[in-house]
């Protein structure tokens, strides 16, 4: 796995069918601020399907701490790092989600790139150096690139 930090807008980078977007959300799927709000603006189905997705997550994915979706031919993996939108994630909750992401990726060899913001580091206030180390350790078996965007 190669991790590259890129200054620029996550959504300005060319997306291909072998890419996935990854970002953090709460299990209530509020998505009302930060990068989650930008995702919900770019993919309006997040808003219209919020109750359905939150219910589906609670029934099928809550142990995994991720919720993968396909919207407009775009693969998005939501890392569920906290229960409610006003909570803050911990390094432990992020680690659990990253481990689930690693399992998810091991079953999808067609994924060549992960496009993500500095997860957990905006409104959630985790330290990027620590998060970066967690990503590198947890996704070391991923045979592709992790592109992390910052402004």
Question: Regions from the language model: what does each represent?
Answer:
Residues 1-151:
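Macrodomain-like recognition of ADP-ribose-binding/processing modules
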């Amino acid at each position: 796995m190669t991790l590259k930090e890129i200054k620029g807008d996550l959504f300005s980078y060319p997306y291909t069918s072998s890419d996935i977007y990854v970002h953090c959300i709460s299990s209530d799927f509020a998505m009302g601020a930060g990068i989650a709000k930008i995702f919900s603006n770019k993919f309006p189905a997040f808003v219209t399907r919020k109750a359905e997705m939150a219910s589906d997550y609670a029934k099928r994915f809550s142990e995994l701490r991720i919720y993968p979706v396909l919207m407009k031919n775009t693969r998005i993996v939501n890392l569920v790092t906290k229960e409610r939108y006003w909570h803050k994630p911990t390094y432990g909750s992020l680690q659990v989600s990253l481990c689930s992401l690693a399992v998810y990726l091991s079953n999808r060899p067609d994924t060549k790139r992960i496009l993500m913001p500095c997860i957990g580091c905006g409104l959630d206030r985790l330290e990027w150096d620590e998060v970066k180390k967690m990503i590198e350790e947890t996704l070391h078996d991923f045979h592709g690139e992790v592109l992390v965007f910052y402004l």
